[in-house]
Amino acid sequence: MTSPANPSEVTRDRRNRGVAFVCAGVFVAMVGMSFAAVPLYRLFCQVTGYGGTTQRVEQYSDTILDRTINVRFDANTSGVPWEFKPKQREITLRIGETTEIAYVARNNAPTTTTGTATYNVAPALAGAYFNKIECFCFTKQSLEPGQTYEMPVQFFVDPEIVNVPELKNLKTITLSYTFYPNNQESAEGPAEGAAKTQKLGG
């Protein structure tokens, strides 16, 4: 005959099972949060301009200032067999004025390749005031073998930038893009450790 279980052992077994269930639940929650972290971080960056992330808008500025600012354009690739460059390296425009420029990409691979562009602005604080209306970076881009494709960007610099003490004397903004293979997790948000660039001032 089997002797009855010791009450203390039963209690300990129940406690151990409870701890195991809690640990398993925490693990599942952490895995779920890790998958959600990237899109949530991107959304945060796009809303606040964190780390030089530019803003996406649907309408033009209704205010155009007499003051001008220079915008430089930078292009990079990482892991895609493309030539990628801006048609113009630098332009001068009035603050609040909507302008369209273009980048050009050429696929040097013997197969069709697809890329996704990440983007940021320097100085990082200016990202919250750099507003894009149209951009190739909003969607993935596919190029056939040897295809050359011109990709427009339509943007303006928010007039509110002149009310920010750290930016009121800013002369030049640099807009930078990097194309990654579409099957990689691209970082539309900033690099780790980038400075916060939430809009300041009135």
Swiss-Prot record:
Per UniProt, what is one GO molecular function of this protein?
A: copper ion binding
Give the record's GO CC terms.
Answer: plasma membrane
Known InterPro entries for this protein? CtaG/Cox11_dom_sf, Cyt_c_oxidase_assmbl_CtaG
**Keyword Protein biosynthesis included in the entry's annotation:** no
Q: Where are the transmembrane segments?
A: 15-37
Sorted alphabetically, the keyword list is: Cell inner membrane, Cell membrane, Copper, Membrane, Signal-anchor, Transmembrane, Transmembrane helix
Q: What Pfam families is this protein classified in?
A: CtaG_Cox11
Q: Which GO terms describe its biological process?
A: respiratory chain complex IV assembly
- Which residues are exposed on the Cytoplasmic face of the membrane? 1-14
Highest taxon, organism lineage = Bacteria
Record topological domains on the Periplasmic side: 38-202
What does the record say about its membrane topology?
A: Single-pass type II membrane protein
Task: List the subcellular locations.
Answer: Cell inner membrane
Functional description taken from the UniProt entry: Exerts its effect at some terminal stage of cytochrome c oxidase synthesis, probably by being involved in the insertion of the copper B into subunit I.
> Which NCBIfam families does the annotation name?
PRK05089.1
Q: PANTHER family attached here?
A: CYTOCHROME C OXIDASE ASSEMBLY PROTEIN COX11, MITOCHONDRIAL-RELATED (PTHR21320:SF3), CYTOCHROME C OXIDASE ASSEMBLY PROTEIN COX11-RELATED (PTHR21320)
Family as reported in the entry's similarity comment: Belongs to the COX11/CtaG family.
**What name is this protein filed under?**
Cytochrome c oxidase assembly protein CtaG
Q: Which organism is it from?
A: Chelativorans sp. (strain BNC1)
Q: Which gene encodes it?
A: ctaG
